[in-house]
């Protein structure tokens, strides 16, 4: 099934699921796989995930819940929502929905929770597929512990936080102690997000089953390597450098040359806004606490 005529359906954080989606009986009749993604841009690594899903479930429908104009990095996406949705559809997705910005720019836990909650509300997604660097048997017990931590775990976590470590680092070190045979797994970026997906499924009591796909290549490398699966970061760097030959090789298709929104596109507007704000106003924004507002204002001078 290929719904190239479908465009993105847009959600607000409190909106009901669009009736057009709920009435797609052809999706309800199939095994349906959900993917929470950004596709900035869609590249061969993402195509590998599609291929693995099709290998396991040849007749499955793939639904992509994709970030819109802004990504989890906090910067605008290089390509428009419609351009990225079209790339996903042309490479095998059956439907693309937009992940609300309120979830798309959040930390990993809330990015995952927001995405999983929307796929759950559709009512016909059977599996949640995501990339990992380790097996599900390593990650699932850790996710269960994070979602329902015992007092010993919480005590060790608090001790690392009190020592000045970030929450992510503290969590990773505490998991290392509990699962020493898999200690490296808890610091790998795709595993960290995978843990959040598993926690979200458990928290929501979802009937969706996890479908992890092992990642190939370094998905966070700064440069492209011939013959390897690329990182989105390296692909974006080649695009910004206008190395379209390398970008095409990494993505497997001809990328549109315009319009592109570079990460610096909003710099002047952001600086203007920051230079006209007070610390009290900045503290009204999510996560802008513990002196971060002062550091931002100092950097904006």
Ranges and model annotations:
Residues 1-6, 11-12, 17:
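Short terminal hydrophobic/aromatic SLiMs and anchors at protein ends
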Residues 9-11, 23, 99-301:
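Active-site cores that bind ATP or allylic diphosphates and position pyrophosphate for catalysis
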Residues 26-84:
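N-terminal catalytic cores of NTP/NDP-binding nucleotidyl/phosphoryl-transfer enzymes
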Residues 86, 90-100:
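A glycine-rich helix N-cap at a beta->alpha junction
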